[in-house]
Amino acid sequence: MSISHRLFKHGMVLLAATFIVVGCAMVPTDDIKISSESDPKANLKGYKTYNWAGSAALVYDPAGQWEPPEIDLDSEFRFLIDREMRAKGFTQSAANPDLLVGYVAGIDMDSIEYKKNPESKIKVLQNVPKGALVVVLIDTDTLFPVWAGEALAEVQKNITAESTKGRLDYAVSKMFAEMPR
């Protein structure tokens, strides 16, 4: 393979990576707050395998204004969590796993908070629906949680499927970045 062909090939890969990074940067994420907590007595490096404990998504949105109808959120959550677990060195195993993974996602449509009116600069009460995702890793021997991550965010109205996926990706990635391993 010639040098110019290799340079072209590497240049195209770099260009594609740049578009991916720039595309992800356009997804609004400044309202997403991440926190996590781990059991100080648990050695997360000692765990190797996991399996799913279950999940719950608590969203009632018949009009489809908060949850894009073309997205299966349960599948999206599982895909992202699986990806992060594998990136941390865990292997999924149905037979005798070290950890059980569970999550719950929900939306509080009645959340109210002070927001600054951009025209008058006065704070007023507004309905600001909030969404949350909590992921928990449970030791299968003790059945106690050893790590939990949480993402809280304002729910974006009439958001595209791509933006929703980008926000979820950001939240799950940041959540697992805080996991000691």
Describe the role of every protein-language-model region.
Residues 27, 88, 95-146, 150-158:
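Surface-exposed short loop/turn segments
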Residues 24-79, 181:
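A structural "domain/chain start" motif
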Residues 2-14:
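Bacterial N-terminal signal peptides that target proteins for export
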Residues 25-45, 128-132, 139-181:
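C-terminal/domain-edge helix-coil "capping" segments
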Residues 75, 79, 83, 87, ...:
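Solvent-exposed, polar/charged alpha-helical surfaces in well-ordered, non-transmembrane soluble domains
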Residues 33-38, 82-88, 118-122:
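N-terminal post-signal-peptidase region of extra-cytosolic proteins
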Residues 63-72, 89-90, 156-162:
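Second-shell loop/turn segments in exported
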